[in-house]
Amino acid sequence: MASASPRRQDLLDALGIKYKSVPAELDEHFFPGELPRKAAERVAREKAEAVARNFEHGLILAADTIVVCDGKVLGKPQDEDDAFLMLSHLSGKSHEVITAVCIKDIDQAESEVESEVTRVYFRSLSPMEIRTYISSGEAMDKAGAYGIQGLGSVFVERIDGCYFNVVGLPISRVYGMLARRGTNILRNE
């Protein structure tokens, strides 16, 4: 897996998938005018390709998650002030969480990229709630500056779509992509 994300690791561990975590050393930038979904897909592919250079065989799983609100892409916050601005922007609104997944089959020299979109609805947040949340430390390593699986869950009124996508890995989609490559995680082999 081309990621050091503890949330993605937890999800794969829960499914019993054996993997090696190798973070991709990559500048996750977006090009001017690039559509958010296409940008996330490109970054996921670049992560998979960067990590694949270190292996001769196997499958590489890479993902990139972004948050989009009012047309603005929110990645991981640079600092606490940036996190405050992001959460203030999300307050009382809905936004999209886009996770792009790339599976690179080194043996077949093929890559497959898909993405999942989940709409998340935030309640209105007070500045004090935002500051308290940021002081927990949870905001700093997550796209959009919140984690739906932790304290950030108190901000969420509802979601439309895949919960695991918001966590960082759309499990059902990953299952389908792996199954098409001959890897059935439901078998005990």
Curated annotation (Swiss-Prot):
Reaction(s) catalysed by this chain's protein: dTTP + H2O = dTMP + diphosphate + H(+); UTP + H2O = UMP + diphosphate + H(+)
Enzyme Commission code: 3.6.1.9
One Gene Ontology term of the molecular function aspect: dTTP diphosphatase activity
GO cellular component: cytoplasm
A biological process from GO: nucleotide metabolic process
Residue numbers marked as site, Important for substrate specificity: R7, T65, Q149
Hydrolase listed as a keyword: yes
Record-annotated active site: D64
Compartments reported by the entry: Cytoplasm
Pfam family, one: Maf
SUPFAM superfamilies reported for this sequence: ITPase-like
Keyword list, A-Z: Cytoplasm, Hydrolase, Nucleotide metabolism
Required cofactor(s): a divalent metal cation
PANTHER family: BIFUNCTIONAL DTTP/UTP PYROPHOSPHATASE/METHYLTRANSFERASE PROTEIN-RELATED, BIFUNCTIONAL DTTP_UTP PYROPHOSPHATASE_METHYLTRANSFERASE PROTEIN-RELATED
Role description: Nucleoside triphosphate pyrophosphatase that hydrolyzes dTTP and UTP. May have a dual role in cell division arrest and in preventing the incorporation of modified nucleotides into cellular nucleic acids.
NCBIfam families associated with the record: maf
Record protein name field: dTTP/UTP pyrophosphatase
